[in-house]
Each structure stands twice: as structure tokens, then as C-alpha cells.
Amino acid sequence: MNAANRRKSTSTVGITGRKDATRMKIEQMEKERKERRKTMMQRKEARKQEHMKNIEAGNPGDVDFIGLVEEWRREQENKIGDKSPPSLFASTNSNICIAVRKRPISDKERQKLDHDSVSCFQNKVWIHSAKLKVDGITKYLTHNSFQLDHTFGEDSTTEQIYLATTLPLVDHVVSTQGRATVFCYGQTGSGKTYTMNGIQQILAYDLYGQLAEHTDDLEITVAFFELYSGNVLDLLHGCQRCKLLEDGNGEVNITGLREVPAPTPEAFLQVIEEGHSLRTTQKTEANDASSRSHAICQVFLRDYGGNLRGKLGLVDLAGSERGSDTKQHNSQRRTESADINTSLLALKECIRALGQKSAHVPYRGSKLTLILKDCFSPDSKTTMVATVSPGASAADHSLNTLRYADRIKEQRVSSNGQRGKAAKASNREIMPSKERLMRIAAATEQADDQHSAFVQKMLAEHDQVQADANDYAFTEQVDEEEADDEEGDYEEESEDLDYEDSEGQDYEEAVESQYDHSQEAQEGEEELRRTVQAVFELEEALLNQHMSNIQANAEMLTQEGKLLQSVQAGGLSEDEMHNYAIQLAEFLDKKESLIYKLQSKLDEFQEQLAREQELARQVQLTQY
């Protein structure tokens, strides 16, 4: 009996001990859970404060990605340390200068919670692309860098850009009677037209000042026209259509284009303003007032005999677009986009050939490069200012813009064949005189005031910048992370490795499917681009044939009138009536032939247009 009681007592003590251990483990788990919740609330509060701080700084968006970008920038600043900043002045030995300008974050981007994803340091520009790992939670950044001649951040002034990119071109045109061209290139809405307007504002006073110092026997005339869907339109004379012709000597002439005298800087700016007011713009996905044409301002320096003594081109290129961005457009918008991208591709090849000092420059690739043929001569100078949008949603567009500029820059560097100290020794900088700097500073006062107002408008904090939407998005994001953390607490010890394997396999299959889908979409877009280009060419042929028919009919109408008058006189012999019938039959045959040619062109155009619309529908379905 005593032995039984002892066994029962021992068993009771063992059970009690196990209960105490279980209770202690539960209490420990509860304590850890409270600690996690406390830490989570602290992190939530810290993220909220960081989110509000970013909004006040004019940079809303994902707190984690913004933090990663800022951390990366601090590391870069530490690496740079006390290194001297790059010079703002251009070198004299290069025929090609490539620069990039980053604009400030816009109100529209703030409302979309779009954070700043572009950084500029020491003539290099980085694009930070936000990514998620396979788990769909862990965030990280990828960095794409590009080394260019000059990089300008959102705080750069128009004066700095002018000194680095355009000032040496003015010296080249005035001193050597040469040719020079400034291009502004980039995604629609990235600030091309704004940058070009600032350059023109300063150029107006700097060019006239340099001419006054060097010579007094030259006068300035200006031609301002746009290239829209393959048509040359004179912006200074009611958008009259001009013809692009090439004579037997290879000289390109724009018939019907008139030059306007500009005796003073004020007259020059008035001409520029008039031209900009008539430029073709349309609404696109990226910009409500996107420039859909290449605006070309040509400044001619002529002596009093009319002989050309220098030429400077200011080209504001149309906004570049990818094929997938035009899937919702009608045929006219798609034709515009195809023509824009074709001309930009041809322009890149011409500038590369110029940088390589190639014997052949493919300027016949588009009407844009054909117009600028004389600017691609070996002794000409070219500057390209690539503009990029800082928003994360535009990262792909910014990458394409910088790759375009980098291809040109890469070819120029390799063609020079100079590296290290040898290259630096030949890069003699252009240092303008004190009087010229003062003149430029005075000229930029108005432009800089506009720039400052623009920056303040873009960077100022608004009381109602989608505050409710921001708070909702932030709370939703934090709640999702909290739910993920809690789910991880309860499931971290019961994860199944087979499930992970199957998840990885599903992910790989999804990636492969997405790749195949992307390849199919790219092929469809390429076919659509070729078809749109064919539609554009057939449209041009149809219009030319129609015009030829009208002219031929007018000539025949005059001849028919004379023939009819000769018959109506009366007293005609049988032979004369027979000749009348023969000539009338010839007129009818000619008219029938003209109608047949025009009808054939029309049928071919309509057939190709129907094919273009069908391909556009297929590409749209492929995108989704």
C-alpha cells in the first residue's frame, strides 16, 4: 500500500512538473509575442514618421525603397569625399558632347507616390530600380550607371547647362564660320522643351555679344520649322508646308522655307516664341501636352552679300516612346510615334558616324538627318542634352534614354583612342572672359527666375497632396507587413521544404512564360512598327499621286478648252472632226490612266491601313 502511494505521489509530482514547464513555455511565448508586437508598433510609428518626413521633403512613396536610395547616396558621398567637383566648362578637342539633365519630381508624380530614383554624382548618373525578391516581400535595388561628359541634377541652373554644352558651339560658329547643333532628347515629359527654351534665352544675348566683339559685317536670320509625320511645316509663316529636295551637288534645300531677320536679341526671342506657339502637341500617356514634332530652329550668320558664314541649329526632338506606350492610340498617333522613333534611330547612327570620323554618314535614314546633313560634316560640333524623369515609374524610359546617349558617348570615346593622362592633357577647357560671364549672367536672370519658380513649384509641400490617399496606402502597407510577420511567427517552424521547391518551380515556370510572352509582344511591336512605317510611305505616295493628277487634269483642261473652241467655230471638214475625235480619245485615255493610278494607290493604302489596325489590336491583346 505504501509503495502504491509512493508511486502515485511520484507520478503526481512528474505531471505537475510537466505542467509547470508547459505553463512557463506558454508564458515565454506570450512574452515574446508581446515583445514582437511592441517592436512592430515602434517600427510602424518610425515608418509613419519617416513617411511624413518624406512627404514634407517632396519625395513621397515607398519608405523602404526611399531609405535604400538615401543609404546608397550617403555611401557615394562618403566615397567621393573631398574630391573636387567636375568642371562646368567644356573642352575644345571634342566634336561631340553628351550631357544629361534630371528634372525635379513633379506634382503628378507625388500624387502617384512616385519616389526619386535617379542620382547624379561626378559626371555619372545612376538609375535605381526597385525590385522584390522571389518571396515577394524582401525589397532591394539594382543600380545602372552611365558615364557622360556632364551630368546635371535637379538643382542645376540653366546657366550651368549653357556654359558646359552650348557656349563652345557659339565660339565655333562665330570664330571658324563652322556648323554646330544642339539636340535635346528624352522621354516625353522629361523637360526637353524647358531646357531648350532656357538655352535659347541665353543664346540670344551671348551670340549677339560675341558677334559685336569679333565682327560687324554679319547679320543674323532665323528659320524655324517642325518635322511632323514626315512633313516640313514653316512655323514662322502659318505652318505652310515645304518640300525637301536634294540637288545634283548633294545640297539639301527646303523649298518654301523663309528666313526672318533678327537684328536684336529681343527680335530673336520674339521669333522663337512665335514658332513655339504653333508647334504641334498632342496628349499621350506620359504627358498631356507632348511635343509630337521635331522643332528645328536654324540660326544663320550671313554677310551683307547673303553668303553663309556660320550656322547654328537648335533641335528640340519629339518625345521618344516605346511601342507598348502607343497601344491605345489611333492610327495617326501610331504613325507619329513610328516616324519619331525611326528618325531618332537614324540620328543616333549619324552622330555615331560623326564621332568615329567615318567616311560615310547615313544621313538618308530619315528626313530629320537629311535636313541636318551639313551639321554632320567632320568639322562640325554637336551637343546632345538627354533629359530624364526622376520618378520610379519612368525608370525604364530613363534607362532607354541613357542607353541611347551612352551608345553615342561610347563610340566617341573609343574613336579618340586616348586614355588617362594623354586624354586629359588634350582636354583644354574653354574659359570665358569676365565680361562674357557677366553678359550670360544678365541674360539668365529671367531664365533662372523661371527655373527657380519651377523648382519651388515642384518641390514645395502642398497641404492637400493626397494626404488621405497617402495615409491609406501607408496603413495598408504596414498592415500587410504586420500580417506577414504574425503569419511567419506561427508558421516558421512548420515550413515544408517540398512546398518551397514547388513554389520555386512555379516561379521559374512563370518567369519562362513571361519571357515567351515578352518575346511575342516584341515581335508583334516590331511588325507593327514596320507596318506603320509602310502606311506612312503609302500615305506620302497617295498624296503625291493625287497632287500630280490635279496638275495633269488642270493642264489637260486648258488644252481641252482650246480644242473645244477650235471645233465650235464651225465649218470644219471631215478630217478636222476626225482629228478632234482622236485628240479627245487621247485626253480620255490619259484621264483614265490617271484615275487608275490614283485608285491603285488608294486601294494599296487602305489595305495597308486595315492591316495596321489589325496588328495594333493584336499587339494590344498581347500586352494583356
Curated annotation (Swiss-Prot):
Top-rank taxon: Eukaryota
Keyword list, A-Z: ATP-binding, Coiled coil, Cytoplasm, Cytoskeleton, Microtubule, Motor protein, Nucleotide-binding
Biased composition (Acidic residues): 478-511
UniProt protein name: Diatom spindle kinesin-1
Limits of the Kinesin motor domain: 95-411
GO biological process assignments: microtubule depolymerization; microtubule-based movement
Record family assignment: Belongs to the TRAFAC class myosin-kinesin ATPase superfamily. Kinesin family. MCAK/KIF2 subfamily.
This protein's GO CC annotations: cytoplasm; microtubule
Bias-annotated ranges (Basic and acidic residues): 17-33, 42-54
Binding of ATP, residues: 186-193
Job of this protein: Involved in anaphase spindle elongation.
Main location: cytoplasm
Region spans: Disordered: 1-59, 478-528
Gene Ontology terms, MF aspect: ATP binding; microtubule binding; microtubule motor activity
InterPro entries xrefs: Kinesin-like_fam (IPR027640), Kinesin_motor_CS (IPR019821), Kinesin_motor_dom (IPR001752), Kinesin_motor_dom_sf (IPR036961), P-loop_NTPase (IPR027417)
Localisation per UniProt entry: Cytoplasm, Cytoskeleton
Species for this entry: Cylindrotheca fusiformis
